[in-house]
């Protein structure tokens, strides 16, 4: 749901009222910009959520802020440390982690009765109901993927570089948690609950051996503490850092997983039905797999039952504390009295989990598909894509071919025929859109590999699902490295399919197989950058919807390495100085359906400095991140193309006769068919292995697998296409059959994203390094 302040807030509760005029006077003096509108009056309302530290929405004119303060009255020791919240948010904001911008901390209790801090108000979506009603299953899955990826990001931060000295002890975290929450519970208990005592004893006796692991943990990481982008399934702010410290990361992951084991006798924390009744929510094992993949750790987590039991124990302790404050009259929420009845069921659930062995590895399907198993959602989407292709895409091939044949000499040849645009709207309506991007689709690379194979069977199918190159790579760049302004201006319309883009890297006057040869310059000039140089093989530049170019160039700096002199910048195609010189043919084919491949000149093009992506000298780094998944996407589609070619070959071999027998009865043709099937199975497995490596280890660690399939797939498919052409004779190279065009496409892939020879050299280097490490280990 869109965050609605009027619905999320109430009049300040009587026990939390404070002197608003005193606060306003203080903020006028200490918060820059707060008093700029002298006619505006400060209004204060209180958020319904926030059971611990009272949270308030401040509005003054067009300015909006959020204030967090300590609750009044007698408090439990070491609780409600507002200064710690401010400190950790300030540190996280400085490294780009999504938190509201912290603005001011006040330790002077005389201003509003307690210490407090103020942060920016973040406008977005907060989902109070874990089942996330009102969105499609695809969006629901993507929201949960983004949620767990953000948690993995938090746990991957280097705590020593955050400047949070003495923020937490870290080592021995689990033992301290059990001890702390036992004491907190005992200090606030209003009745005896045997399950709490038994669970406390079990936890203390079963502490994990890995209690020395430490990172920054949130302490209360769950769906309704997250602000999502208004339109995208992307986390833009993590809230409520009261319980954060240095500790064991699995405590956060277990807390996020509470709803998977929620007792049916108890209403859900965030309303909603139970997990089994919601389509699109990943299985717990799938969520854990995504988390572990992002952190590069083994998904088979030891002591998972301990962390789940600890989470229920901790939540029961929190519930008891909330009820205790209600009894004392300083509760932060209207419905605090309801928590009294939750303590015992939570404790009993934790006790039950302590006696179970919990698996964190996704369940496997049948033995045949066990090697690279798709997720439940991946299987569902693949089935729907296959059905969509069969019912809508393949039947449209003839109409699309006729359009480009009729418009080959007109400007309309660069546009999509109406049938493709209709198919795109249909695919979007069915949720089969942007499937390549895990944060949007909720799919893994293995999931997408098999989907991309299906779309590779038709020239224009990737466009139908908004999964076409080079837009997929450019959207990946903006998603991973773009600023909020860049995402809003360019990523959002790309994700909607309103515009397309072009990637400008290869140059006509240098050997582009060595990317460091680049001549195109990107030079700073005040508040702008000047882009000057020539690019070619800029795919998609001729599409009338192409509105933005992602340009790689040199920002010269003699004091750094040759891989630190490249930068990447966004250049709107209508900027003065951007010139489309000519389209380039591929074996005579113009590739109209994808907007062609163009030579583009940038003649002293001036763009704002804010168009630079990530920073100066980061271009090569971004390129490697972009090309990793992008390279295997090409290979995934090529497997589908190979299947289509083999189908055409077999049809011909069955229909035609030579020398008194069918073509397939000639041993040489039969062997070609057999060798083609073997080759397809080989490259499919290697493609899936590369996808699996990206899923589990990340793009950097999967470099060798990516390079291997980038060499193997196009080469194998070229051979299959050559055999099919040979089976067709002269017809195979004519316009009557698609084989010549297919061969042109796949032959080009042996050059695109780096030629075979560059990848072979890289593979050899990595193999020698691996062998050297193994030899050293044996010695």
Swiss-Prot record:
One of its GO terms (molecular function) is medium-chain fatty acyl-CoA dehydrogenase activity. Pathway: Lipid metabolism; fatty acid beta-oxidation. InterPro entries: ACAD10_11_N, Acyl-CoA_dehydrogenase, Acyl-CoA_Oxase/DH_mid-dom, Acyl-CoA_Oxase/DH_mid-dom_sf, AcylCo_DH-like_C, AcylCo_DH/oxidase_C, AcylCoA_DH/ox_N, AcylCoA_DH/ox_N_sf. It is found in: Peroxisome; Mitochondrion membrane. Substrate binds at residues 513, 628-631, 754. The modification Phosphoserine is found at residue 210. Keywords: Acetylation, FAD, Fatty acid metabolism, Flavoprotein, Lipid metabolism, Membrane, Mitochondrion, Oxidoreductase, Peroxisome, Phosphoprotein. The modification Phosphotyrosine is found at residue 323. The modification N6-succinyllysine is found at residues 368, 390. This is Acyl-CoA dehydrogenase family member 11.
